[in-house]
Amino acid sequence: MFYQPAQNKKQYDDLADIEAQNNVPNTQEVLEAWQESLDSDEDESSPLEESNGFTISEHDDFVKSVPRKNNPTDLLYSGKLLDSDEPPSVHGNSSKVPSKHPSPSFPETTSLRNLQNGSKQKPALPNFNDPHFYNEDVTRSGHPNRSIYTQLPRNEFSNARVLWNRLSARDRVLWRWANVENLDSFLQQVYTYYTGKGLSCIIVHRLFQILTVSFVIGFTTFITSCIDWPAVTPHGSLAGVTKSQCIAQMSPITYLVLWLFLSFLLALWIYYLTDIPRLWQMREFYIHALKIATADMPTVSWQRVLYRLLKLKNVNALTAEDGRVVSLHNMKRLDAYAIANRIMRKDNYFIALINNGIINIELPLLHRRILTHTTEWNINWCIFNFVFDEQGQLRSAFRNPNSRKRLSEELRRRFIVAGFLNCLFAPIVAIYLVIHNFFRYFNEYHKNPGALSTRRYTPLALWTFREYNELQHFFDERINDSYAAASHYVSQFPDFNMIRLFKYISFILGSFTAILVIITVFDPELMVTFEITKDRSVLFYLGLFGSLIAVSRSIIPDETLVFAPEKALRRVITFTHYMPGWWSDNMHSKAVQQEFCSLYSYRIVNLLWEILGILLTPVLLFFTFPSCSQDIVDFFREHTINVEGVGYVCSYAVFQDNPPYESVASLVQSRKISPLIQNKPELSRISFYEQFNTEAPRRDLR
């Protein structure tokens, strides 16, 4: 919960303590020391957390951590006494530490009692302007929390607040970070801002997204309702065929559809506009707390962001070490492993549901597994919005075996309701998707017909390949690196009879095209006036033959291609990390290639399935998903584990130390592929260790 200035002023008025506004802490010198520590390259190992064998380093070269000497910033962030081995007390009056200066008193209990009784007695506040206030012994003996930002009263538990406009931008950012209570949501916002490449990129992306939707709606409405198409030929001009007051002449159904689209567009505008303050606060967090400039956002690595974030852990009361503000039992863990688990808490469950076959996504009649973006959205709404609460935590009812029947019935009803909603809006969404994809890809396929043969992974393949605790940008890098190897593997199984056929077709069409080009060179007017068939000129056939030749040549493999399917498949597996058991002894077979092609399909086929998925998803919601509701409830209960400092997470995403292999490549490139490649949790652990451990060989991250 972030700070609210208006509420702050009201607190001061109620307490009749306006003089307290003058006691704003002067933290400039301390913050300058902290900034020097953050920007320094000599002490980059002090805030790093080593948990489960994972060590984070800021730089891409992953220099090994070197213990640093104590420096003045430990006063604020280390939470450990420099001159004494005695641990500080959680309660300020329970122990006394020798000090050169008298310890300030903090009569917080009296202040809270005055608030409850309505007394106008001024609460006694610490004198932040005292030059000896920040003495380490005084500070540590006077208050259990050594950070000045967590010494500021926390939200609704406060009895007096520092005047907001007296704080600098950097102080306000650290104040917000010190008062973060929903750590899952905040870390997800930090990661989303990172993948969005900064405030300007996110706003521009959203702006053009809205403009694209507006253009599709407006242009489609104009060409379908505002043009008199039968009058196009006689008039020969746009002004002569444009209808006046075309909106008023629309049919009721068209009018309703238009208003639905406009309502959606308005809601999108409102959401994006109201989200700008949150994005601005995240921008300030990156600039003032993480010390990452906006200009560096497109190129900064996640390791650097993570390193800077870990240096702030002692500023937040929930993540500070040694339980100085909260007990060790309630302390939130903050390291690379915990951050990945918090960001991917729901995604880890989704990966497990798909890879373990808990959700049946096979169409009843077609006997084909289908997973489109529409199906993903419905699964998230029906299952994850039901399983997790507003704080992003697993509901306690799903851990109770006695609630199994009730939860499965509620989940079944959610599937049925979602099915009716999909039936209601599916035709409208399908029409929009067809028009949008037509506008988007027509020019590409028209100018480059060979693009029809390009392949992309299906959504089902992507969720099958993704590993536990693998952040989205790491996964995108891995998959993007695999496309060249995957296309090379698919071309290892040519149909030589079809190749000869397309070579012949390409030769015939090329001959006709050559003659037509030569004719038009001598008389350019023949390109438009000369008709080869009725109403079809030379220009038409030049475009047609050129497109067919491009498609034919894209099917014909390169003459220098070396056929080694087993070697090519091993190369693909190093990126996809996917190999069913029966592939091991059949890498050369056509059956393996066909199964792989079902995951690595033509892009145009994927687009068609996305459109059909809008219409077929209600079938899954009505007939397939309800029968899985009890298995889904059982899965969340049986495969949920409580990790201290992280909360309840998917058991498959819980890693142990020291994996047996240093990298996934070592599993695949050996003479006999290790059966460990089929164990996704173990493979995920190896990949995670490879990404974040200093000693493991790893590829350079872009």
Swiss-Prot record:
A Pfam family: ATG9
InterPro entries: Autophagy-rel_prot_9
GO biological process: autophagosome assembly; macroautophagy; mitophagy; piecemeal microautophagy of the nucleus; protein localization to phagophore assembly site; reticulophagy
Positions of the UniProt region annotated as Disordered: 35-128
Main location per the UniProt record: membrane
Transmembrane annotation, as ranges: 206-223, 252-270, 497-522, 538-555
Modifications made to the protein after synthesis: Phosphorylated by atg1. Atg1 phosphorylation is required for preautophagosome elongation.
Residue ranges, compositional bias (Acidic residues): 38-47
Intramembrane positions: 422-446, 604-624
Bias (Polar residues) ranges: 108-120
Lumenal side: 224-251, 523-537
Residue ranges, Cytoplasmic side: 1-205, 271-421, 447-496, 556-603, 625-702
Listed Low complexity bias regions: 94-107
Functional description taken from the UniProt entry: Phospholipid scramblase involved in autophagy and cytoplasm to vacuole transport (Cvt) vesicle formation. Cycles between the preautophagosomal structure/phagophore assembly site (PAS) and the cytoplasmic vesicle pool and supplies membrane for the growing autophagosome. Lipid scramblase activity plays a key role in preautophagosomal structure/phagophore assembly by distributing the phospholipids that arrive through atg2 from the cytoplasmic to the luminal leaflet of the bilayer, thereby driving autophagosomal membrane expansion.
Family statement drawn from the similarity comment of this UniProt entry: Belongs to the ATG9 family.
Official protein name in the record: Autophagy-related protein 9
Organism of origin: Schizosaccharomyces pombe (strain 972 / ATCC 24843) (Fission yeast)
